[in-house]
């Protein structure tokens, strides 16, 4: 019986050794199987990380473009507002210029009696006040006679030959031109020397 017991113990020991060997082999196989799985998972995580970084960079670039667009919009709006303020009176001044021309023509009359002289003096005073008010608003008359012809400031309606003037010089002003600050409201209508 002792021999049987010894055999049983040996069998149990062998079974235990076999089980341990199988367990060790299974663990090794699992570890080997896990290693590629871990590598695959690492590669997958790295790929996801790279994609997320690219998306983040894309979003940051988009945000920078939106911010730049917004800054440009604010700058344009500010410039438009400044221009609107600077030239706010342009329309009414443009409408007043023909009346001013007629007023200046009326001042050209030759007074034949004392009453007409008095009226002319009053009109000259009003004319000076109108010109002063326009000057305060930033309106200036465009210089013409004797100046070089500038297509931005002058409108040539005739060409003449006059030795007293240089070539391409304005000889005569037919209608006054005006600027509002740096913008031409109406160009001077002129005769130009050839």
UniProtKB/Swiss-Prot annotation:
Residues 1-44 are annotated as: Disordered. HAMAP family: GrpE. Gene3D superfamilies: 3.90.20.20, Head domain of nucleotide exchange factor GrpE (2.30.22.10). GO terms for biological process: protein folding. It comes from Bacillus licheniformis (strain ATCC 14580 / DSM 13 / JCM 2505 / CCUG 7422 / NBRC 12200 / NCIMB 9375 / NCTC 10341 / NRRL NRS-1264 / Gibson 46). It holds the Pfam family GrpE. The keyword Cytoplasm applies. It is found in: Cytoplasm. Keywords: Chaperone, Cytoplasm, Stress response. PANTHER family: GRPE PROTEIN, GRPE PROTEIN HOMOLOG, MITOCHONDRIAL. Homodimer. GO terms for molecular function: adenyl-nucleotide exchange factor activity; protein homodimerization activity; protein-folding chaperone binding; unfolded protein binding. Belongs to the GrpE family. Residues 9-25 have a biased composition (Acidic residues). One of its GO terms (cellular component) is cytoplasm. Participates actively in the response to hyperosmotic and heat shock by preventing the aggregation of stress-denatured proteins, in association with DnaK and GrpE. It is the nucleotide exchange factor for DnaK and may function as a thermosensor. Unfolded proteins bind initially to DnaJ; upon interaction with the DnaJ-bound protein, DnaK hydrolyzes its bound ATP, resulting in the formation of a stable complex. GrpE releases ADP from DnaK; ATP binding to DnaK triggers the release of the substrate protein, thus completing the reaction cycle. This is Protein GrpE. Its main location: cytoplasm.
């Amino acid at each position: 019986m002792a021999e049987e017991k010894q055999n049983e113990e040996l069998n149990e020991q062998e079974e235990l050794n076999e089980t341990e060997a199988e367990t060790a082999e299974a663990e090794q196989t699992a570890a080997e199987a896990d290693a590629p799985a871990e590598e695959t998972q690492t590669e997958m995580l790295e790929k996801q990380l790279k994609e997320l970084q690219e998306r983040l960079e894309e979003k940051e670039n988009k945000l920078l473009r939106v911010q730049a667009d917004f800054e440009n919009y604010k700058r344009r709006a500010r410039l438009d507002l400044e221009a609107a303020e600077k030239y706010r009176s342009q329309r009414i001044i443009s409408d007043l210029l023909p009346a001013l021309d007629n007023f200046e023509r009326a001042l050209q009359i030759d007074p034949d009696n004392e009453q007409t002289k008095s009226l002319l003096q009053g009109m000259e005073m009003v004319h000076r006040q109108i010109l002063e008010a326009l000057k305060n608003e930033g309106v200036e008359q465009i210089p013409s006679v004797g100046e070089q012809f500038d297509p931005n400031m002058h409108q040539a309606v005739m060409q003449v030959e006059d030795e007293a003037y240089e070539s391409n010089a304005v000889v005569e002003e037919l209608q006054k031109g005006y600027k509002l600050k740096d913008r031409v409201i109406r160009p001077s209508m002129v005769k130009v020397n050839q």
